[in-house]
Each structure stands twice: as C-alpha cells, then as structure tokens.
Amino acid sequence: MAGRGVKRALAALAACAALGASAADEGWYLQVDNDVFYGTDRWYTSGARIARVKSRGDHQVEIGVLQEIYTPEAKRHNDIDRPNAARLLATVARHDRVPGDWRTLELDLGVTGPSALGRQAQEFVHRYVSAPHEDWSHQRPDRFDGQASWVRTRTLGQESSGSPHLDATYGAVLGNQVAFAHAGLELRFGTGGAARDMSSPALRFAATPPLSFAQDGSWSFFLALSTRAVAWNHLLDFAPDLPQSTPRLRHAVQRFLGGFAWSHRLAQVTFVLVHDTREFVGQRRDHGFGSLTVHVPF
C-alpha cells in the first residue's frame, strides 16, 4: 500500500509538472507602450495590447485587441507636425517556435478615426497624469484599418548556454494605412535559458508575447538596431477639410533599442527603451518611448 501511495504521489507530481510546462506556453499578456518614459507627449505617444495565447499542437494561437495613439507635439507648436490619430484593432496571430527560430503571422482588422477611442483613452489617462490639452479635431473621419504582418526571428550561429548570441529579425507589415518592410539585429546576453528565448514587439513590429521554453528563473539584457523601408503611412494624413498639409513621409527610418527580459515560472516580463529617427520631413527631432510586456501563464 505504501509503495502504491508513493507511485501515485509521483504520478501526480509529474502531471503537475507537465501542466506547468504546458501553461508556460499559454496565458494572458499585456503590452504597454508610452513616451512617458522620456517625459514627452508627442508622435507615437501610447499603445496597448491585451491578448490571450493558447497552445494548438506544435504552435500557439493568439487573439487580442490593440490600440495605438499618435499626436502632434503637445508641449510646443511646430509648423510641420502630424495630426492626432488612433487605431483600434482586433488581432489574431499564429506563432511557430522552436529554439532559435520564431515565426509570427498576424492579421489585424479594425478602424482608424474617432471610433478608435483615442481621444477618450487619452483624456482618461490625463485625469491622473497631467499633460497639455490635445486638439482631436485634426483627425480624419473613420476609415477601415486592416493589415497583415509576418516576421521571423532567428539565432545566428550556434548558441551556447551562458554566452552572448546574435539574433536576426526581418519581416513586413502590409495594410491599407501603413506598409513597410524591416530588418534588424539583436545582441542578447544573460543567465539561464528562459529569458534568452524572449524578444520585444518593438523589434518585431508584431504580436510578441514574452514566452519562453524553459521555466527556470533567469534574466537577459539586449541591445538591438533595426531599419524599416516605409512604402506609405496614412496615419500622417490630416482631415481633408483642414488647412494643414500632410507632412512628407521619410521612407527610411532607423530604430535603436535596449532593454531586459526576466522569466520565472509565475510570470515573464520584457522592458525596452526605443529611439526612432524622424518619420517625416520637418519633424523637429527623433522620438523615444518605452515598451513593457507582461505575461502570466495560467
């Protein structure tokens, strides 16, 4: 009887371990982008994504909601600037991952314009965080907003535990509002296996839950650079009945970023600071924002 009890206890522990390993690939995650980390209130000023990731055989499926808010520079007037704009998108993505290789295919459908609730979201936040008033009359009327994204992140060379490694990321976003191709390199170093598997949506330009293959507590730091070739960006367009002219698009934009990832069996976190070069001709200076992603497996 005692032997049977021990066997049952061991079987139960094994089942719990298997459940925990499966849950590490699943759960809710929240991504928050904001330029408050730089003390500014301009251009790409806020973004939020909440999504659920679920394992489906050899891949994960993700369903979520994404909102992005863009504004002119609120703390000073510029003769050339972008209009207020917001996007509200329903998102679905497929993640195919093996160690050293991560491919994501994402489809987003929604609206750009007043129905994206950019003004309401900004006013709600500004009740608690003091900021200059924004004039949302410059945004265009509601328009359909749809896009498809594909991105791949690969480890270059043979990765060995505990040593720095280099990842290459490349992909494209094709939509009726924005379209661009991008490519970048990321140097990552740290301890343990879990955090080394994690990347940042600021580098991949797509849904990027902070998932890891291992469950050991670990951390990593990373530095990255990326360039994107922009075909069009209609989020820069002013409403047609306004006297302001739409700023001229820059077709090449560079991105520099640095941050850290932390992984534990209870949660995974990534944080990154981003520096973008100018997106349009006449933009007063480069732009920066921070991006925080938190995943809770359950």
Where are each of the predicted segments found?
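Residues on the lipid-exposed face of transmembrane beta-strands in outer-membrane beta-barrel proteins
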Residues: 48-54, 65, 90-96, 109, ...
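Residues that define the transmembrane beta-barrel architecture of outer-membrane proteins
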Residues: 42-48, 84-88, 103, 140-148, ...
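Transmembrane beta-barrel strands of outer-membrane/channel proteins
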Residues: 28-34, 63-69, 107-113, 166-176, ...
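Short loop/turn motifs that connect adjacent beta-strands in outer-membrane beta-barrel proteins
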Residues: 23-25, 55-61, 97-105, 155-166, ...
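Outer membrane beta-barrel transmembrane domains
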Residues: 27-29, 33-38, 73-78, 192-298
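N-terminal signal peptide c-region/cleavage motif recognized by signal peptidases
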Residues: 18-22
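Long, hydrophobic/aromatic-enriched structural stretches that serve as scaffold segments
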Residues: 56-123
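N-terminal ordered "arm"
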Residues: 25-61
